[in-house]
C-alpha cells in the first residue's frame, strides 16, 4: 500500500449538509471521492440524495428528519466513523486530497496537537479568517497572516481534522450547542487539556463564509438570534464566565417583552421576532442550566 493509499484508509470525511445546492455539493465531493465519505443531511433532502448516490460511493448517507443543528450532526458523524481520523467538511469549502494529507501529517508531526485546520482563501484568492482568538480574548474577524504553521486558540469547524479517540477522550462535541460557539468551546476544551490547535500554513482551502440558508426572512431572523443568544450564553456558562453576559441579558428581558408587543401592534414584525427570539433563548438557557 502506498503512503497516499494509507492516508486515505485512515481518514473518514464527514460532510454536514443543510439545504445545499446540488452543484455546490458536487464541487465539494469531487475533491474527496477517494475517502470514506459520511453525509449527514439536516434538511432530509431525499432528492439530493437520489441525485448523488449514482455518482459517489458513500460509506454512509444519513438523512435527519429535522434540523438537529451542526453540533449534533457533528457528534453523530463522529460516532459513525470506523477510521482513526475524521475530517469535518462543509459543502461550501473546497479542499483536495493533498491538502487534507498535509493536515494529517501536521497532526502527527506536532506533539500534543489535537486538531489541525487549513488556511482559508476566498474565490479570488484572498486570505480569509480561520484561526484566531477565543471569543473572550479578542476579535475573530481578522485573518492571520501566517508565515508557517501556527498554534491558535480556535478555528472554524468548516474544515478540521482530528483523531477520533482523542476527541472522544475529552468529551467529543457538546450537542447542547446548535451551530454557534461549538468550535470555540471544543478548542477551549482542547486547550484546557494542555493540547494544541494548529492552523496549517501549506494546507489550502477555498471557503466562502456563507449565509443562513433560510428563505423566509422572519424565520431567518428568529433562527439566527435564537440560536446565537442561547449558544453564546451556554458557551460562557461552560467556561464559568457567564455572570456578566447573563446579568446584561436579564436586565433587558422585561424591555424585550414590552418591545415584542409594541412592535406587533405597529406591525413591525421583524423587530418583534428579534426580541421574541432572544427572550425565548434566555428562557431556554434558564431551563437548561438552572441559572437565572
List where the protein language model places each region.
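Short, well-formed alpha-helical segments that are part of the catalytic scaffolds
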Residues: 15-33
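A conserved acidic beta->alpha catalytic loop
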Residues: 41-50
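Glycine-rich, basic loop-to-helix element that forms the pyrophosphate-binding segment
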Residues: 64-81
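Short aromatic/hydrophobic "clamp" motif used to bind/position activated sugar donors
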Residues: 86
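Conserved donor NDP-sugar-binding/catalytic core segment of glycosyltransferases
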Residues: 98-129
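Short, flexible, basic/aromatic active-site loop/helix in glycosyltransferases
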Residues: 134-153
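A short, conserved alpha-helix in the catalytic core of glycosyltransferases
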Residues: 154-162, 166-171, 176-204
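Non-catalytic, C-terminal membrane-associated alpha-helical segments of glycosyltransferases
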Residues: 223-231, 241-292
Amino acid at each position: 500500500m502506498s503512503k497516499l493509499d494509507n492516508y486515505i484508509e485512515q481518514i473518514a470525511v464527514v460532510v454536514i449538509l443543510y439545504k445545499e445546492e446540488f452543484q455546490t455539493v458536487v464541487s465539494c465531493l469531487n475533491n474527496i471521492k477517494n475517502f470514506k465519505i459520511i453525509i449527514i443531511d439536516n434538511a432530509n433532502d431525499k432528492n439530493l440524495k437520489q441525485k448523488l448516490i449514482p455518482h459517489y460511493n458513500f460509506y454512509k448517507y444519513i438523512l435527519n428528519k429535522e434540523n438537529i443543528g451542526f453540533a449534533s450532526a457533528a457528534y453523530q458523524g463522529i460516532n459513525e466513523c470506523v477510521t482513526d481520523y475524521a475530517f469535518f467538511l462543509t459543502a461550501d469549502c473546497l479542499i483536495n486530497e493533498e491538502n487534507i494529507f498535509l493536515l494529517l501529517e501536521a497532526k502527527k508531526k506536532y506533539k500534543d496537537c489535537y486538531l489541525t485546520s487549513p488556511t482559508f482563501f476566498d474565490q479570488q484568492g484572498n486570505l480569509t479568517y480561520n484561526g484566531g482568538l477565543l471569543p473572550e480574548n479578542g476579535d475573530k474577524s481578522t485573518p492571520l497572516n501566517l508565515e508557517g504553521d501556527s498554534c491558535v486558540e480556535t478555528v472554524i469547524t468548516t474544515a478540521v481534522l482530528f483523531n477520533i479517540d482523542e476527541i472522544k477522550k475529552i468529551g467529543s462535541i457538546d450537542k447542547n450547542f446548535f451551530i454557534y460557539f461549538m468550535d470555540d468551546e471544543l478548542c477551549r476544551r482542547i486547550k484546557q487539556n494542555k493540547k494544541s490547535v494548529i492552523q496549517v500554513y501549506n494546507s489550502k482551502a477555498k471557503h466562502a463564509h456563507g449565509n443562513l440558508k433560510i428563505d423566509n426572512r422572519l424565520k431567518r431572523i428568529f433562527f439566527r438570534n435564537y440560536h446565537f443568544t442561547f449558544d453564546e450564553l451556554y458557551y460562557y456558562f461552560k467556561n464559568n464566565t457567564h455572570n456578566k453576559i447573563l446579568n446584561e441579558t436579564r436586565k433587558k428581558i422585561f424591555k424585550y417583552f414590552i418591545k415584542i408587543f409594541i412592535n406587533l401592534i405597529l406591525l413591525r414584525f421583524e423587530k418583534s421576532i428579534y426580541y421574541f427570539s432572544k427572550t425565548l433563548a434566555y428562557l431556554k438557557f434558564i431551563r437548561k442550566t438552572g441559572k437565572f
